[in-house]
Amino acid sequence: MSLMREMLEAGVHFGHQTRYWNPKMAPYIFGHRNKIHIINLEQTVAKYQEASKFVKQLVARGGNILFVGTKRAARELVATEAARCGMPYVDARWLGGMLTNFKTVKSSIKRLKDMEAMVADGGFERMTKKEGLLFQRELDKLNKSIGGIKDMNGLPDALFVIDVGYHKIAVAEAKVLGIPVVAVVDTNHSPDGIDHVIPGNDDSARAIALYAKGMADAVLEGREQNINGLVEEIGEGQEEFVEVQDNQA
């Protein structure tokens, strides 16, 4: 099935009501039907492919991308696809300073990992009932807020965002730090400040599943290229080493 057909079936072309539109999205709008803006899927396909290419190349160079989707319709889909491709994700509330104050976030990540290590060591079983309850409560809270980024050792090289209006703070923090943003932008939001705009419906679960799967696939393809490149480099290095040995012999 063609990408255009998949997008049609997922309802990617359905924007918001015309009265809520953002005029800056005009270049991506085909028209309107029943007071709903219809997004030009030719534009969406092209922009989606550009974004996928960017993600693939970024990962092929060893970069990582933070998936962000905290709306109810996006949470599970974003977490599942990010986990499938081994990338960090935020599926609960975006905590202010998650990027701009990463030092503090890192100390929370350390706390979470220490607590998980205690559980693995059986430390949890040695606690009193009250201690155990408080411990579990803190562990659950940390897991919910930063569980998806616990293996992120530094700032991400890019963000992939579903719904820029819902994640204004995440986009603003990335902008301050010069981190490129790939984002799904619906007809009621502004594409300003987004490096790779994917014009499309940001509410439909089927549409969100399509974007998230596509970006995860791009990550996996990029990683394969990265691994193949490293293997080739190692191979070339070994060949040179063998030649030197032969010359000495």
Curated annotation (Swiss-Prot):
Pfam families: Ribosomal_S2 (PF00318)
UniProt GO cellular component terms: cytosolic small ribosomal subunit
A GO MF label: structural constituent of ribosome
CDD domains per the UniProt record, alphabetical: RPS2
SUPFAM superfamilies with a match to the protein in the record: Ribosomal protein S2 (SSF52313)
Keyword Iron-sulfur: no
Keyword Mitochondrion: no
Segments passing through the bilayer: none
Top-level taxon of the source organism: Bacteria
An individual GO BP term: translation
Keywords associated with the record: Ribonucleoprotein, Ribosomal protein
Family as reported in the entry's similarity comment: Belongs to the universal ribosomal protein uS2 family.
PANTHER family xrefs: 30S RIBOSOMAL PROTEIN S2 PROKARYOTIC AND ORGANELLAR (PTHR12534), SMALL RIBOSOMAL SUBUNIT PROTEIN US2M (PTHR12534:SF0)
Protein's recorded name: Small ribosomal subunit protein uS2
Top-level taxonomy: Bacteria, Pseudomonadati, Pseudomonadota, Betaproteobacteria, Burkholderiales
